[in-house]
Amino acid sequence: QFASSAASDVYKRQVLTNDNLDELDRFDARCRLSPGIIPEAMALIVNKTSPSMLKKSNLSHYEMIRQFVETLKRWGKATYIGFNSIEFDEEFLRCTLFQTLEYPYITSTNGNTRGDILSLARAANLYYPNTLKNSVNEKGNDVYKLDQMAPLNGIEHGDAHSAIGDVIATIGIAKLISKKAPNVWKASMLTMDKNQSLELIKKELLFCTNEYFYGRSRPYVQTFICQHPQYQWPLCFDLRHDPSPYLKMPIKELTAAMKKQPKFIRTVRHNKHPVIMNPSYGNQFDEYKLIGTKKLEERAKMIKNNEAFAEKVSSVKRSEIDEKEQTKSQEDLYNEESIYAKFTSTEDNKIMPEFHSVDWNKKLQVISKFKDERLQYFGKKLLYMEKPEILTKSDFNIIHKDISKKLLSTNNENWNTIPRTYSEIDTLRAKFEKENQPEKLKILDDINAYVEDLEKYYSSA
């Protein structure tokens, strides 16, 4: 079964389907704005939602996430799909779960797998042109935006990005791919689990996959060399290149060659749902067709039979890692940014359910059991948002000042800040005045008033 999702700071939408993508159940909830959170102004406008509407919701963010997690547990094992979900929604969900004292990797462990319909749509159109209809931008490239693709492909989904429309549209695109490009759909089923994906890449003599950059999908017929020493991603040789000169190169020369364009070694991120096709698909493209299957196989065997080359490539990558470590910024990460800095321990993971099950007045005792300081911080931050009177004055002030520092920052941060939001409001106001859109201007005024109140409250911290 599949679960298709979309998420933000104030809503969570998920639809459960069977293997034929027919809906079985759904989760659709909207919550109050959490203290110190500024949603993107444009996201609120697209959703026709104002801060005053969100203030009226009875559900807090913490309660919404609790309901959501319980729903996923009830649904059981599933494949989680979305549109650009692996790069965006999944990362957003992981960080949200991490900060809500839930296990962050719920969608890719315990028999669950994940896939991305955006990368699938690009692969389908590359190998089976016109599987999906796209609008074209001024550079002549296909546009892969859900709100534009859905109507072009006859998908009825209500208003894209509103209510649950974007989730329904994603399922509609998935259905079209499964019908019109079934081989791409079948291939995608084999790489939704990262371990299965890695096994497939290592086992095949050669395979065809695609990458998307500068607005276009490009095919690559490749063979596995070795895994990246730090990230474990498969490093593969692009077989349009003759491997002979590279196999003999001393390490210094190979290091220099690996920095040049075009790249002869490519990274396949096996944990991000690559679409691995039969190498015969490469014959659709001149750069591989002209070389021919026989020669491509010979080149693949040369790589596979040369362990010394694999060791050299691995060594070059290890040197790159050391170099990066030395030049790495020494700036401290905020707790909220530290999800990948280190994994939470098994012991701490076992304490998380206890935090959720006890009454609010007992949660501080549970927080003190966490060994990981980040989890202690998140626990206290949840109390700050839900039951601030339980916190000591000192703990309240630490979190209050921390939120204030983040919100008032004038740096280019990974989160929304007050100065950035004012700037976005000014830009949007000029746009909507020009387009004569009073409804949108009204929401904008509401957002502006909300941000002014936030600024007053946190400026005194």
Across the structure, where does each feature detected by a protein language model lie?
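Metal-dependent phosphoesterase core characteristic of DEDDh/y 3'-5' exonuclease domains
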Residues: 9, 16-47, 72-182, 188, ...
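Conserved DEDDh/DEDDy metal-dependent 3′-5′ exonuclease domain
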Residues: 44-129, 282-350
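Generic detection of long, well-ordered alpha-helical segments
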Residues: 58, 62, 87, 164-167, ...
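Acidic two-metal-ion nuclease catalytic site recognized across multiple nuclease folds
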Residues: 176-307, 404-461
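Substrate-recognition/cap regions that form aromatic- and gly/pro-loop-enriched pockets
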Residues: 312-418
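Metal-dependent nucleotidyl/phosphoryl-transfer cores and adjacent nucleic-acid-binding surfaces
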Residues: 8-9, 15, 34-43, 57-64, ...
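Short strand->helix junction
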Residues: 4-5, 54, 160
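Single conserved hydrophobic/aromatic residue that forms the stacking wall/gate
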Residues: 1-7, 11
